[in-house]
Amino acid sequence: GLHGEFLPASKRYLNDYIQYVTSDFLAGLGFGATQMLGETEGIYIGYSLDTGRNVYLKPALASQGVKGSVTNALAAAFVGSLGGGKSFSNNMIVYYCVLFGAQALIVDPKAERGRWKETLPEIAHEINIVNLTSEEQNRGLLDPYVIMENPKDSESLAIDILTFLTGISSRDGEKFPVLRKAIRAVTNSEERGLFKVIEELRAEGTTISTSIADHIESFTDYDFAHLLFSDGDVTQSISLEKQLNIIQVADLVLPDKETSFEEYTTMELLSVAMLIVISTFALDFIHTDRSVFKIVDLDEAWSFLQVAQGK
């Protein structure tokens, strides 16, 4: 009977080995069942080892709402083991997209792309590398009130950053309303900056507001924290006019993947906070000139996706 079970159209003779599985398991069985990979034209990214056919990719296709396209998901992730070629594949696709007319913004926290102007001379004139150091000339460039154009967006980002740094939850009925009120007052004023939030909290004069102000001010003692805080007098901003823009932040100290949020050091908190600001700014960049295909490339995205504000 057990042998007969393997014959097509045969009945089941033994019920001891039945496995109840989910739809995910069944879907996993179908992986590799087809040889259809990529598009019929586009960027050449490799070939199939089984068939020898070239594989082409058109990253802009999903964003155009083309009739008959299989997916309209705009996000893509590169996952794999260390040294598996994730960064190389990512860089290659971004590079070719720029050659095809796209505009790209890469958030490069590990500063691995600092020599692209020298190594890619054919497009050097269209590469803009923004290296944010702790020098005085860069003071306040990552302040939410400086980097975001819309005051409401600045206010929302300021809340995310300050609640992230201080650990104040929106469910905290005592501290959160006080912090929210101070940020709203700064948003409605003429001079906007995170240092002004500290001044508003001190002007409140209560024990809770003073405690929050002291907590926020304690972060400003670090040199590269000056990127996040301004007095509202910063007039310059980060320019993204070139085809390929790379934002690097020097001295970032990113936590290990295994480190829980509660175990983050002060430097790690500030580093992730800066990545949250830059990433929010990068996503805002997508909404400019919708006629141009744009790419926002978030390297080391896991570091800020581990916390609620980063997500």
Feature map (PLM): residue ranges:
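Hydrophobic positions in the central parallel beta-sheet of the AAA+
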Residues: 245-247, 296
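Helical/strand "switch-coupling" subdomains that flank nucleotide/phosphate-binding cores, especially
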Residues: 133-236, 241
